[in-house]
Amino acid sequence: MQALLTEILDEVRPLIGQGKVADYIPALAGVVPDQLGIAVYGNDGQLHVAGDARTPFSIQSISKVFSLVQAIGHSGEAIWQRLGHEPSGQPFNSLVQLEFERGKPRNPFINAGALVICDINQSRYAAPALSMRDFVRRLSGNPEVTVDNHVAESEYQHRARNAAAAYLMQSFGNFHNEVEAVLRSYFSCCALRMSCVDLARAFGFLANQGFCQHSGEQILSPRQSKQINAIMATSGLYDEAGNFAYRVGLPGKSGVGGGIVAVVPGQFSVCVWSPELNAAGNSLTGIKALELLSERIGWSVF
């Protein structure tokens, strides 16, 4: 496995320079673009890494999975009264569909859906951002996971579109807490800094029927774990989820920090990171690396 991961990174490295680092969040615009790492974590506890797998980066929308897991953990099926689990086919920050569907987001991985989930968590936790940080520390086994407050503040200063979505949902009665407070919590979650190793370990429970191997916790039921993997497969890469399913064939979740996590149910969780994005906001080199890994090992849910 180690040799294969190194070989794949060497093969995809020439793609660096063809994408573009996220620049609509000023604090992310200065990320060194030629970094590349991958980590594979098995249900047997074995870890395989290559490249910059231990370098922390901003996880951004990957955090939406953790928020969803928290909400399901304390509220169960009730959350689906406020949002759906269908693909949107629209950009992740679209307002048009949200207006047309009367303030009920299509799924928890577009921004509007993630804001509803954060609103649900805001009603549950006294300090939602700290609760999230502590949760991912447990999942990853890394007590050093932190929030990059500079990134969180930068996102808050450029919050107009997310605020518009939240106020639009509030106008339809689907947002219950103070919008600015929820936005603060949301951006703090997005600004968590984790490495490929951290994320591969943190997603291990989704490859293991909801059981976290290194903490010994049953995070979700097997049924709930299957459901989250299904939503990741249909909606985890914004409006490029179909292309990812076609090329990689695994449940996945991306973030504009350049990370992509993928799950091989019953076997492995994987995280790849390369900061340059394609036009859909997903790591250009990261998708290719996962495609090659899936092809050469024969991993696919299809």
Curated annotation (Swiss-Prot):
Catalytic function, reaction form: L-glutamine + H2O = L-glutamate + NH4(+)
Alphabetical keyword list: Hydrolase
Gene Ontology biological process terms, A to Z: glutamate biosynthetic process; glutamine catabolic process
InterPro entries with a match to the protein in the record: Beta-lactam/transpept-like (IPR012338), Glutaminase (IPR015868)
Gene3D superfamilies from the UniProt entry: DD-peptidase/beta-lactamase superfamily (3.40.710.10)
Coiled-coil region list: none
Residues annotated to bind substrate: 61, 111, 155, 162, 186, 238, 256
The protein's Enzyme Commission number: 3.5.1.2
Gene Ontology terms for molecular function: glutaminase activity
Domain of life of the native organism: Bacteria
Summary of subunit composition and partner proteins: Homotetramer.
Recorded family membership: Belongs to the glutaminase family.
HAMAP family: Glutaminase (MF_00313)
Protein name: Glutaminase
Organism: Ectopseudomonas mendocina (strain ymp) (Pseudomonas mendocina)
Gene for this chain: glsA
